[in-house]
C-alpha cells in the first residue's frame, strides 16, 4: 500500500475511477492520510444499487452526502445503476445538479434478481430543464419521464441514448429530441407502452442515428418515423414489428446505412439513401423496396443478409443499381425460420451480364454449398471482371466430410478475372 500511495494523484484517481461502486471509492478514505480526501476528486463515479440488500432511502442518502462532499470541478461520468426503486428519482437528480457532469447514465439493471418490470425510475423534469449546462452525454434506460411545465433544454448535449423509456406522449419525446441544438449521436430503443406512435427526429446537427423497435411492440398499433436530419451521416434502423414505416425522411449526406426490418414499407427510407457508401440490408421483399430509377452511385460496400426468403431478389436489384460497387458480402445474420421457403436461382430472368463492373472483393460467410448458393457464386465469379479476392467461409455446423465435398464442388473454373485469388475457410 505504501508503494501505491507514492504514485501521483492523477494515476491514483484513474485507479479509483475503475472501482465498480462509489461505495468502494469512498471507503478508501480510511486507508491513510494520503487517501483521506483523494476520493473527493475522482472524475468517474458509479452508484450501483442493483445487487445490494439495502432500502432505497439509505442508498439515496449515501448518494446525496457523498456528492455533496465531492470536490472535483467536473465529473466526467456519473452512473446510477439501480436494481429496485421506491418513489421517484428526485434525490438522484437533485444530487447530480450540485455537480458539473459531462456524462450522466441512469438505468435499471433488468437482469437483477431484485428488479421487476414494475420497478422503474420516475425522473423529474428538472433533468431536462437546462440546469446541466455541461452535460454532453446522457443515457436513460428503463425510466419514466413525467410531463411538467418546465421548458426542455439540453444546450450542450451531443450524445443521447433513450432505451426502454416511457414518455407522456408523442409531442413530449419529439420536443425532447429537438431541444438538443448541438446533438450529434442519437439512439432510441422503443418499448411497449411507451406512448409513442410517431417518433419525429428533427435535429439539423445530428450525424448518427439508431432507431430500434423490437417484436414486443403491439403489431396492430402503428409506429412511424419522421426523420429530418440534413447532416446525418450514419443511420441504423432495426425494426421487428412488421407494421412500422418511415413516412418522411430528409437525408442527403448519408455515408453508412443499416436496414434490418420486417416491414415491407421501406420505399421512403431507402429512397433517401442514394448517397450512401456502405449499406447493410435485411429486407423481407424486393418489391417496392425503393423507388424505380434510384441509383446508388456512391455505394462501394454492400452487405446482404440471407435469412429472408427474398434475399436473392433484393441482392440482384441493388446490384443492378450500384454501378461503382467494389465490395460485396453475403452473410446469414439471423436464424432461419423453418417454414419459410428458400430462394431459387433463375439467371436468365433475374440478371443481366453487365453487373458488377467494378467489384474487387467478394465474401460469403456461412456458406452451405446448396445448389442455389453454388449457382450464385459461379455467376459472380463469371461476370466480375475486376475481381481481386473471393473468400468463402463455410457454415460452422457443417461436418468435416461435407466441408470437403463443398470444397471439391466449388466452381473454381468460373473465374473471369485472372487476378482473382480464391480463399475457402472454415467458420469455427
From Swiss-Prot:
It comes from the Eukaryota. Residues 344-394 form the FBD domain. Pfam families: F-box (PF00646), FBD (PF08387), LRR_At5g56370 (PF24758). InterPro entries: F-box-like_dom_sf (IPR036047), F-box_dom (IPR001810), FBD (IPR006566), FBL13/AtMIF1-like (IPR050232), LRR_dom_sf (IPR032675), LRR_FXL15/At3g58940/PEG3-like (IPR055411). Residues 2-50 form the F-box domain. PANTHER family: F-BOX/RNI SUPERFAMILY PROTEIN-RELATED, FBD-LIKE DOMAIN FAMILY PROTEIN. This is Putative FBD-associated F-box protein At5g56390.
